[in-house]
């Protein structure tokens, strides 16, 4: 890394395990400065519950970034709306969660931070607070005014991107248009090159229907939409294999010769990845004007403050973000 960079972290739902995981992250040295966008009392109280040392130092944007020393975090303060009891949701803190996301996103957009790592949020409590919220991906897409973003989940062995994300199954076929596929594949290809450092990405593309349509006998979306788009993009030099049946694509004979998989919808690609590497996966938002990674699990309210939360996914998300920072420098 040419110089020390700052990475901003949002712990997510304050009553969940996000604060626990951030405190655990702080127990080791990091080659970047970790700036946590959160309430100070929340973090110090959670550290005390876990019996872990934590020193918070104030965020100083005009000072050079310093590598993180064990037992410390840099604090960018955002105040809670209500006091927190570990494991118990408070509706007003839905506003607090969104405020942390907005501040962290804005800091990435204005160049304060090289990457953003997000902890798990509780979508229900945010919506109950009167804030329409579908998820991190959509929130950052809108706030950054990105033209289009793509959701990817990754483990050490497998990367899966999604053509569509949080749509009901009944709406997916209509959503798979030539324009969408052109846009999604272009973003996936671009970010595999620039953020992952893969010179010539090899992408496996799932069909939409069982058996990838069986030559039109089980749906025509492959013939009408997917194949023509892939042919056009192959002619431009992209290495695309597909459309392939999703029930056979996830085999070593295909995956060993690919850098990423493009699934047509959420539950087509992610169950395989989560079965293979649950707790080790990372959620990545492609197409943003900054690096964003996240844990692949939920708030686990029942584990908050008990010292039983597994920090593995957060560590993987941070390590991947650091690698992506290096690749983009």
UniProtKB/Swiss-Prot annotation:
Leading EC class: oxidoreductase
Localization, UniProt: Cytoplasm
One Pfam match: PdxA
UniProt cofactor note: Binds 1 divalent metal cation per subunit. Can use ions such as Zn(2+), Mg(2+) or Co(2+).
GO molecular function (one): cobalt ion binding
Catalysis performed (reactions): 4-(phosphooxy)-L-threonine + NAD(+) = 3-amino-2-oxopropyl phosphate + CO2 + NADH
EC number(s) on file: 1.1.1.262
Domain of life: Bacteria
Cystine bridges: none
UniProt keyword Zinc present: yes
InterPro entries the UniProt entry points to: PdxA, PdxA_fam
Keyword NADP belongs to the record: yes
GO biological process, one term: pyridoxal phosphate biosynthetic process
Residues spanning the membrane: none
Binding residues for substrate: 136-137, 274, 283, 292
Keyword terms, alphabetized: Cobalt, Cytoplasm, Magnesium, Metal-binding, NAD, NADP, Oxidoreductase, Pyridoxine biosynthesis, Zinc
Pathway: Cofactor biosynthesis; pyridoxine 5'-phosphate biosynthesis; pyridoxine 5'-phosphate from D-erythrose 4-phosphate: step 4/5
Quaternary structure annotation from Swiss-Prot or TrEMBL: Homodimer.
Annotated protein name in UniProt: 4-hydroxythreonine-4-phosphate dehydrogenase
């Amino acid at each position: 890394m040419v110089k020390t960079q700052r990475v901003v972290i949002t712990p997510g739902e304050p009553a969940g395990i996000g604060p626990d995981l951030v405190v655990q992250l702080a127990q080791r040295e990091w080659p970047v400065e970790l700036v946590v966008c959160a309430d100070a009392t929340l973090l110090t109280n959670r550290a005390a519950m876990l019996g872990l040392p934590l020193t918070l130092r104030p965020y100083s944007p005009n000072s050079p970034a310093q590598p993180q020393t064990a037992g410390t975090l840099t604090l960018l303060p955002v105040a809670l709306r209500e006091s927190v009891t570990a494991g118990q949701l408070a509706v007003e803190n839905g506003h607090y969660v969104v405020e942390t996301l907005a501040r962290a996103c804005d800091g990435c957009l204005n160049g304060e931070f090289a990457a953003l790592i997000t902890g798990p949020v509780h979508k229900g409590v945010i919506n109950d607070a009167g804030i329409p919220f579908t998820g991190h991906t959509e929130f950052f897409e809108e706030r950054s005014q990105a033209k289009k973003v793509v959701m990817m989940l990754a483990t050490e062995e497998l990367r899966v991107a999604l053509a569509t994300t949080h749509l009901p199954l009944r709406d997916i076929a209509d959503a798979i248009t030539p324009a969408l596929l052109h846009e999604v594949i272009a973003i996936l290809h671009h970010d595999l090159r620039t953020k992952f450092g893969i010179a010539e990405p090899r992408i496996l593309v799932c069909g939409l229907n069982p058996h990838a349509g069986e030559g039109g006998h089980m749906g025509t979306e492959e013939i009408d939409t997917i194949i023509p788009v892939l042919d056009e993009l192959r002619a431009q030099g992209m290495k695309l294999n597909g459309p392939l049946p999703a029930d056979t694509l996830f085999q070593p004979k295909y995956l060993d010769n690919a850098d990423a998989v493009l699934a047509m919808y959420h539950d087509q690609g992610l169950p395989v990845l989560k079965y293979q590497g649950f707790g080790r996966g990372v959620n990545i938002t492609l197409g943003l004007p900054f690096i964003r990674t996240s844990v692949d699990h939920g708030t686990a309210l029942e584990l908050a403050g008990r010292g039983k939360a597994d920090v593995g996914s957060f560590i993987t998300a941070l390590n991947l973000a650091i690698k992506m920072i290096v690749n983009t420098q």
